[in-house]
Amino acid sequence: IGCSPENSQVMIQSVRAGRILDLPSLPTLSDGTAGGVEPGSITLDFCREFVDEYMTVTESEIKDSLQEFIQAQHMLIEGSAAVAVAACKKQGDRFAGKNVVVVICGGNISLETLKEIL
């Protein structure tokens, strides 16, 4: 499952269109997924081939997931990683009783953003 912030759905919309789209994005805590897809990037083809479905999460869901993950795991993650955590939480009933892997990478979060979410 691929996931994006509602405020920046460029990848999802590009996959659906079958080509890289130049779409506006609103501010998001998920800096790493914000904005466009670079021309010539392998990312679009990779997503088209290996991602079966897509979903979005709100800024509130990203913020809540950041806070909860930091508190529960005592690890710092960035907003992009929290998008995946938020998506998994959003699908909780679907995954109940199953083994689920959420790919979490990156701790690149500014002090200003960290202060904002805490």
Briefly describe each language-model feature range.
Residues 1-49, 95-96, 100-118:
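Glycine-rich phosphate/pyrophosphate-binding loop at beta-loop-alpha junctions
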